[in-house]
Design a protein with these regions (language model features):
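ATP-binding pocket architecture of kinase catalytic cores
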Residues: 45-154
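Canonical protein kinase catalytic loop motif
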Residues: 219, 224-225
Length: 331
């Protein structure tokens, strides 16, 4: 996120670092990177650097409908990352456990804090062209880590946050949460039928995939260039809050559009598991529907105008207007 959370007391963050991890912070600098989570670069009084990540539990639509459910979902994801790293997958940047062994801790009612080792590396951007070199191998290793599945939630082929889309469809009152509520409502209402058609398409694709008995494996969820750091020792994968058990195409759709694309062929050669074209399409569609659910959740609720909510409104405008990309499936 580009702006720090207005309702998080910086002093509470400092105390949580000290109480939970024994980190006496000498310097904390907000890092305006990524989307969905808030990050700080932390330097302790002994010079050790860490990376603190805070999630607003009221703005994690895909993890749960209330702060407690979102915290449980986030804990399951980070516990899975910890299990993956512990199984020998050195490219997994997992959270540093608290003094009590937890992967993350609550900070007040609405926030969760996780602490990561500071990684010197260069990341790409979300919009960068996908580079499958080394990434397919990492994903194949994650998907083969059967023991870690016990820690993960099971998203399967469902649309995360679907309830927020349905609630918006049923809410005919003027949305009044903040400055982007009414513009968001107008944009959503203009494409209400399109969104309904896309949800129905997701259901049809999901039913077809499940009927074929596609395997479900541990998946990262967002292995795009922005979550891949190139370090002196090679590539590492960060941001594991989206971990879930699902068909492998949940991780592959950004690398391959069809089973014949090079990344899909390489994946099959590594795993012996063929890639399903319907599943690639499903998770490409779920990406936009999941984002739409998150944007609706945030913009219908109380909010202020800032760089992040403006980005979320622009994202909503995009997500409601993607029907044309699916004309071949809908017409």
């Amino acid at each position: 996120m580009r702006t720090p959370p207005a309702d998080l007391d910086p002093g509470a963050l400092v105390r949580a670092l000290a109480d939970g991890w024994g980190i006496a912070a000498d310097r904390i600098d907000y890092a305006p990177v990524g989307a969905g989570s808030h990050h700080w670069r932390v330097v302790a009084d002994d010079g050790v650097r860490t990376f603190a990540t805070v999630d607003h539990l009221g703005q994690k639509a895909w993890l749960g409908d209330d702060p407690d459910a979102a915290f449980a979902g986030l804990r399951a994801a980070l516990d899975t990352a910890t299990a993956l790293a512990g199984s020998g997958l050195g490219f997994v940047v997992a959270p540093r456990p608290s003094a009590g062994g937890a992967s993350l801790l609550r900070v007040g009612e609405l926030f969760a804090l996780a602490v990561y080792p500071f990684v010197d590396g260069r990341s790409g951007d979300f919009d960068d062209a996908p580079d499958g070199e080394g990434v397919v191998e990492m994903l194949a290793a994650v998907h083969g880590a059967e023991n870690a599945a016990a820690h993960a939630s099971a998203e399967g082929v469902s649309v995360p946050g679907r309830s927020h889309i349905l609630a918006a469809m049923q809410d005919e009152r003027p949305w009044s949460g903040g400055p982007f509520s009414r513009p968001a409502q107008r944009a959503f209402e203009a494409h209400r039928g399109d969104v309904a058609d896309l949800l129905a398409l997701a259901d049809r694709l999901a039913a077809a995939i499940e009927a074929r008995g596609r395997p479900h494996v541990v998946t990262h969820g967002e292995p795009h260039p922005g979550n891949i750091l190139t370090t002196a020792g090679g590539k590492v994968l960060v941001d594991w809050d989206t971990v879930s058990v699902a068909p492998p195409e949940r991780d592959l759709w950004g690398l391959a559009r069809t089973p014949g694309d090079p990344a899909a062929v390489a994946y099959t050669e590594l795993t012996g598991r063929p890639v399903d074209g319907d599943a690639l399409d499903l998770f490409r569609l779920i990406w936009d529907l999941k984002d739409l659910a998150e944007y609706l959740h945030v913009l219908r609720a109380p909010h202020t105008e800032n760089e992040d909510t403006e980005r979320e409104f622009r994202g909503l405008e995009h997500c409601v207007s993607v029907r044309g990309e699916w004309a071949g499936r809908l017409d």
